[in-house]
């Protein structure tokens, strides 16, 4: 369960579209997230001609590349390495073109992926760039949630689950007045909040969020098949 939870939590901020709008074309990929169908994301990434893509299209590709890298960390390290290298090159190409805080957030994610692959041990760079992103965009729900994610999973002595929970709660409030309220960023962030409540001994709050998510998204297979059953059985 731990590996799946880590994968899903990593993936939860994958749709960092910045200012690119969620469209009907994204709905199948949202369903792919809910149903853990990462090949659909890979197909989308490789079907996009980066050189010919518009800025919005490139932002969209970065969003799915991020999630795809996170997924491959648990299933195919060789593919994860290639995907991370491609993601890094694309992020560098977009320096100065992304909304405030997003370049730094992506760099933080790249350091996290490289750490997971054993290619980099700059743990503090993960936190440094995440903090910079939050400083630049303190009211962006995706960036706020990402910082919560970093603190949730950072090693002991660096991470802080209570601070992470406060950030997840802030992100949840910000999502309510955000263009992303109806995108998958919101349910994904709420899953993180549920997991954080669980890890801080607040099982009832975790159950409440998870049940609400399943009512809203019946095809959220991780919650339906893994998280809720395990949470019900937890002491």
Predicted regions mapped to residue ranges:
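Terminal, low-structured helical/coil segments at or just beyond the last alpha-helical repeat
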Residues: 181-235
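The tetratricopeptide repeat
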Residues: 57-58, 62-64, 103, 110, ...
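Structural register within alpha-helical repeat arrays
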Residues: 28, 61, 66-68, 107, ...
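Short coil/turn linking the two alpha-helices of tandem helical-hairpin repeats
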Residues: 67-77, 108-120, 152-158, 179, ...
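N-terminal leader/linker segments that initiate helical-solenoid repeat arrays
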Residues: 17-74
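Flexible helix-coil transition and linker loops at the boundaries of alpha-helical arrays
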Residues: 47-60, 90-103, 131-140, 172-184
């Amino acid at each position: 369960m731990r590996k799946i939870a880590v994968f899903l939590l990593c993936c939860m901020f994958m749709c960092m579209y910045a200012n690119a709008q969620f469209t009907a074309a994204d709905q199948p990929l949202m369903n792919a997230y809910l149903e853990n169908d990462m090949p659909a994301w890979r197909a989308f990434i490789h079907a996009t001609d980066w050189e010919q893509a518009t800025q919005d299209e490139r932002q969209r590709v970065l969003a799915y590349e991020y999630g795809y890298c996170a997924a491959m960390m648990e299933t195919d390290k060789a593919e994860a390495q290639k995907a991370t290298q491609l993601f890094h090159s694309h992020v560098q190409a977009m320096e100065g073109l992304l909304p405030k805080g997003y370049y730094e957030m992506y760099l933080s994610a790249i350091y996290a992926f490289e750490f997971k692959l054993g290619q980099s041990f700059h743990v503090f760079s993960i936190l440094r760039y995440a903090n910079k992103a939050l400083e630049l965009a303190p009211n962006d729900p995706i960036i706020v949630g990402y910082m919560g994610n970093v603190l949730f999973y950072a090693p002991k002595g660096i991470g802080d689950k209570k601070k992470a929970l406060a950030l997840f709660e802030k992100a949840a409030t910000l999502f309510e007045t955000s263009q992303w309220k109806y995108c998958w960023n919101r349910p994904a962030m709420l899953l993180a909040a549920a997991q954080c409540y669980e890890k801080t001994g607040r099982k009832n709050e975790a159950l409440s969020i998870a049940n609400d998510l399943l009512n809203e998204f019946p095809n959220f297979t991780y919650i339906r098949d893994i998280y809720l059953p395990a949470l019900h059985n937890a002491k």
